[in-house]
């Protein structure tokens, strides 16, 4: 099982990029769910604008689907500058990055998604560009090779990552502003669902939006994906209004429960409860019981379950929590 295949994955699917761009907020005033980030960025952006300077380099990190790309475009819009976007895996050679940097204009934004996946050779080029707005380029080969320095316009690098801990210290230390995006609360997600429903010209009740938001795992990308599937259901079933009943029927059909769990989440938790009597159970045994790779369990399934308090990792293995027993209606062994 691959994370991208799951309906409740925060990772963007290939066909979602165009739709996500259309419903993405353009300015901080419309940016929901990250009040501290919003407040701080408003100050930093206004200060840079008043001084007519490039904003300090910005690192945005957090789980997938929370709006890192959205925030980077908002920053560019608020500063009224151009934004060029790329990603770590695409920048294979120093020349790839040099081509982008030399095409930037004064105070422009360069956005690098998955910045933790930059190759070491590209990262080395980035250091003087970030610090001194200079590009060191090697001309020629062998004994005749020489280094020349190119001056770059002042620019803002925005790096986005789901794995801030994987960044090298020299790269991380060069970001003047660091923002962590948190999972969204129910109210914020409900407003996002209603806003997207308006974009799709859907007749949706607030209760219907709440039902979708509740099952969206605190993630706007998942909320918008579930909204599109609920829209399909309502259209085929000829429902005039997407209320909580229609949303429940659609999401139950999709096997997304009221905690946002899908089949694989429930399979893992039920294995711990039923097969291993609540745990503790080792990772090898758990992987064998549910027929999944250990890496998939650790990297894809467990993080959200642990964060929501349904699973605990202990030195002796995984154990189910009180919330898990309540959710599945099991009595906890004494």
From Swiss-Prot:
A molecular function (GO) term: four-way junction helicase activity
Superkingdom of the organism of origin: Bacteria
Keywords tagged on the record: ATP-binding, Cytoplasm, DNA damage, DNA recombination, DNA repair, DNA-binding, Hydrolase, Nucleotide-binding
ATP-binding is among the record's keywords: yes
EC number(s) on file: 3.6.4.-
Residues involved in DNA binding: 313, 318
CC per GO annotation: cytoplasm; Holliday junction resolvase complex
Stretches for region Large ATPase domain (RuvB-L): 4-184
GO biological process, one term: DNA repair
Function: The RuvA-RuvB-RuvC complex processes Holliday junction (HJ) DNA during genetic recombination and DNA repair, while the RuvA-RuvB complex plays an important role in the rescue of blocked DNA replication forks via replication fork reversal (RFR). RuvA specifically binds to HJ cruciform DNA, conferring on it an open structure. The RuvB hexamer acts as an ATP-dependent pump, pulling dsDNA into and through the RuvAB complex. RuvB forms 2 homohexamers on either side of HJ DNA bound by 1 or 2 RuvA tetramers; 4 subunits per hexamer contact DNA at a time.
Protein name: Holliday junction branch migration complex subunit RuvB
């Amino acid at each position: 099982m691959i994370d991208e295949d799951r309906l409740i994955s925060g990772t963007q699917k290939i066909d979602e990029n165009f739709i996500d761009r259309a419903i993405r907020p353009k300015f901080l005033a419309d940016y929901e769910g990250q009040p501290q980030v919003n407040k701080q960025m408003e100050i930093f952006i206004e200060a840079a604008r008043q001084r007519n300077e490039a904003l300090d380099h910005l690192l945005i990190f957090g789980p997938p689907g929370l709006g890192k790309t959205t925030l980077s475009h908002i920053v560019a819009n608020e500063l009224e500058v151009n934004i060029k976007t790329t990603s770590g895996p695409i920048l294979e050679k120093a020349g790839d990055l040099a081509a982008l940097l030399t095409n930037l204009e004064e105070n422009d934004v360069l956005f690098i998604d998955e910045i933790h996946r930059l190759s070491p050779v590209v990262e080395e080029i980035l250091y003087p560009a970030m610090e001194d707005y200079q590009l060191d380029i090697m001309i020629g080969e062998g004994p005749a090779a020489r280094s020349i320095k190119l001056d770059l316009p002042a620019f803002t690098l925005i790096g986005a990552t789901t794995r801030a801990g994987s960044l090298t210290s020299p790269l991380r230390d060069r970001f003047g502003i660091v923002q962590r995006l948190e999972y969204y609360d129910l109210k914020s997600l409900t407003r996002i669902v209603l806003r997207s429903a308006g974009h799709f010209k859907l007749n949706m009740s607030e209760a219907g939006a709440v039902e979708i938001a509740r099952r969206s795992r605190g993630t706007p990308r998942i909320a918008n994906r579930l909204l599109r599937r609920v829209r399909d259901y309502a259209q085929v079933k000829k429902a005039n209004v997407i209320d909580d009943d229609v949303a429940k029927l659609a999401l139950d059909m999709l096997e997304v429960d009221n905690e946002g769990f899908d089949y694989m989440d429930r399979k893992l938790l039920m294995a711990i409860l039923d097969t291993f009597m609540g745990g503790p159970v080792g990772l090898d045994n758990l992987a064998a019981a549910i027929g999944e790779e250990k890496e998939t369990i650790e990297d894809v399934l467990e993080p959200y379950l642990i964060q929501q308090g349904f699973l605990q990792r202990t030195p002796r293995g995984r154990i189910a929590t009180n919330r898990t027993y309540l959710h599945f209606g099991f009595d906890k062994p004494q």
